[in-house]
Amino acid sequence: MVVQEEVHRQTEVEGGNNIRMTLTRFYISLVLVFSIITSKAQNELDALNLSREEVTGSARTVAMGGAFTALGGDFSAIAINPAGIGVLRSNEFSITPAYHSIISNSTYYGTSTIDSKSNFNIGSIGIVGVKDLNKVGKWRSSSVAFGMNRTQSFHKSYTFTGKDVPNSLIDSYQNTLIQNGLGPEDLDVSNAPYGFDIFLAWQNFLLDYPIFDTDSVFYNATGVLPIDQTYRVVKSGSKRQTFLAFGGNYDDKLYVGGSIRFSRINYTNNYIINENINPSDTTTALNEYSFGFNETISGLGAGLDLGVIYRPTNQLRLGASFKTPTVYSLNIEYESENTAIFEGFDPFYTQSPLIGDYDFRLTSPLQASFGLAYVFGKFGLLSADMEYVNYTGIRMQGISDGYSFSPEEDAIQSFLTPTVNLKFGGEYRVSQFVSLRAGYAIFGNPYNSTVDNFGGFNLYSLGLGYRNEEYFIDASYQLKTSENKEYLYDPNLVEAGTSDFTDHRISITLGYRF
């Protein structure tokens, strides 16, 4: 009961490095594995999200659905196939400011809630230098490029609002304790599975234990009637790729290229679950409580890209590229908090005694792309790409202690699958200087048939451009549609919430040739 003395709740915080590592490893296990099977673990972050990429960058690349493996000739296309640098004929500098807005429509226990988030960013910026080699046999030119492409946006917010939810998050905590035969002595921050959630609920009297009855089990303070729940997630950050690329043009038939890429991840994820107790429930003095979780992940990675474009005829182009896995060194920091409000008492507030801090290595999957393009003289072109991504190749390893993450990697093998992404694009030249563009892309579902979730999405895009010998201006609009299914906690206790996401991205590229 809330009126009993608080002294028996005060658990000594042990702040040693071994405790910190154990807590963090267990946390990453939950995050990177259990979230894959759509159960709500500590948060939404998982290795899959950090490894995926989208069609972003320059306005021309976005407008044509990213179908540039066989085309080249655009700055952001270098990130798709580095051989595309060999197609460029002159030096150029370009920058792409962009506006991104995402709207979510979430349904939970029959109630729909709309949420949104937006931001301005730089989709790409870089410079290309081309050297004429007409005097060196059939090698026409060599090229070098340096710049940045934004390859993934983590910006997103969504809200679940549930009325008359039959179970509580605290019920999930209670079941965990009972099923594992645990007592109050186990609710210590040093006990890895519970230090950032159940421990806080215990400190705030949301879980209790009759200390004078040794045959009793844990009970919770949420009462017996259905409750109202609100769950809000706010994510932000991006994945940016800085690269140095080299390429060449052989006899205007064969274009080759390679690049060294350095990827930077900055990701934040904040969520809060709030539960309001039914005022008619006379079995408890609890009015409401909330559980909040905050985390950041940041770090750097590196990899190599190789590519080739072959032009068997003046109209037909074939392309292929290969991307090695990106090896990231990442740091994760996180903390949690719990607030409980009982009738007649000041609010109880408990913050996680430790701030999670752990360094680990993440290896993203390899990628291979194949493209086909047909150029209709000066009238326009059509292009298509097929991209293979092996998500079962995701690997993890602890940096500070060498922890292998083998159980988590086994789960990745069990729940993820390789995917094929399809991209299509077209360009029609209205006049000598003006072009209209359109694109469509299908990104496959990385979850296999054993997982009740859909991780694929579709992209639709339009654009136009003006180009002359000195400068160019391109604009694009991209629409992305996706969906998600998520359990806030134990799927045996609660229904899944579903979200439909609509992303709107507007990009403008300004370029100067010299």
Q: Language-model segments: which ranges?
A:
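Outer-membrane beta-barrel translocator/receptor signature
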Residues: 59, 71-80, 86-165, 240
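Outer-membrane beta-barrel porins/channels
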Residues: 42-56, 61-62, 130-514
